């Protein structure tokens, strides 16, 4: 009897979850018998991932924020390692989320589990020596940025560029004809607010974004909400009378005149919709000063 192939996939944020879900769907189209388990969110679960952990329980950004959440991170690292070991997959697929996933890659390699990394850590931005660990702990690496294969050649690594999945997502996207009516919007110009996909980001950014509203009385502000987060996070927006839309980010961007976007993958999505944007981010003072010392690139915007 032929054993069904088992794949363990780990993503740790909305964009990675979306990319992981597309990967699962593509692999299922090739072989419907493949079994998937791991860490992810709404999109991965819908695609058929048996969730060991929902990423929303773990997601943290910033140096001091990770330190403060250290016990939580250690708890879920331990849980995932145990689950991965017991599951005994044919291959581990890591999707972005470098700080967490590199720890898992090291564990998997030590336990003779093949490691494939899809969307590797952006080691070219800071601490480039991390490329040596990536080389040591992975068997194959797949990049969505065209310049990365050349960068990794310096470390004698063969990295395959596989195209950017956002281009595919946006190409197949069809705007909703009744977006305004469905969401009870006026026909005033829309300024889209994208405060982020993590609890920590929404807590840090939402009130700052809401403070912009009185400065633009002729526009309507619409917030791109994330379904997997606690609804209470968006209470300030509801109290301010600002419209919220969930799972409609692309529809929102396709109708927006401008946007204010938390730094991350959403900045690239916004740019691909050709929407002028202001990119913002708010972290702790300690994280900010550490980042200023470590990061080798002058921009916080993925687009730049």
Annotate the PLM regions:
Residues 1-304:
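Nucleotide-activated sugar donor-binding and catalytic core shared by glycosyltransferases
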């Amino acid at each position: 009897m032929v054993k069904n192939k088992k794949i363990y996939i780990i993503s740790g944020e909305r964009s990675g979850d979306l990319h992981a879900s597309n990967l699962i769907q593509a692999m299922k189209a090739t072989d419907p018998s493949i079994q998937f388990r791991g860490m992810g969110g709404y999109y991965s679960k819908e695609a058929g991932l048996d969730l060991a952990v929902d990423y929303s329980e773990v997601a943290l950004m910033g140096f001091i924020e990770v330190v403060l959440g250290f016990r939580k991170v250690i708890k879920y690292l331990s849980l995932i390692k145990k689950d991965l070991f017991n599951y005994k997959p044919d291959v581990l697929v890591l999707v972005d989320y470098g700080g967490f996933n590199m720890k898992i890659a090291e564990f998997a390699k030590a336990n003779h589990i093949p490691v494939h990394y899809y969307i590797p850590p952006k080691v070219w931005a800071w601490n480039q020596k991390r490329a040596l660990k990536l080389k040591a702990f992975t068997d194959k690496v797949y990049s969505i940025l065209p310049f990365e294969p050349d960068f990794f050649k310096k470390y004698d690594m063969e990295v395959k560029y596989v195209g950017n999945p956002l281009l595919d997502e946006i190409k197949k996207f069809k705007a909703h004809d009744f977006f305004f009516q469905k969401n009870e919007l006026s026909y005033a110009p829309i300024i889209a607010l994208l405060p982020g996909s993590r609890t920590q980001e929404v807590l840090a950014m939402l009130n700052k974004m809401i403070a912009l509203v009185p400065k633009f009385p002729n526009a309507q502000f619409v917030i791109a909400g994330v379904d997997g987060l606690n609804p209470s996070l968006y209470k300030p927006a509801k109290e301010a009378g600002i419209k919220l839309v969930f799972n409609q980010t692309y529809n929102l961007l396709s109708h927006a005149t401008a946007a204010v976007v938390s730094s991350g993958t959403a900045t690239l999505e916004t740019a691909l919709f050709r929407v002028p944007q202001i990119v913002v981010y708010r972290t702790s003072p300690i994280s900010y000063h550490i980042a200023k010392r470590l990061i080798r690139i002058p921009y916080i915007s993925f687009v730049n």
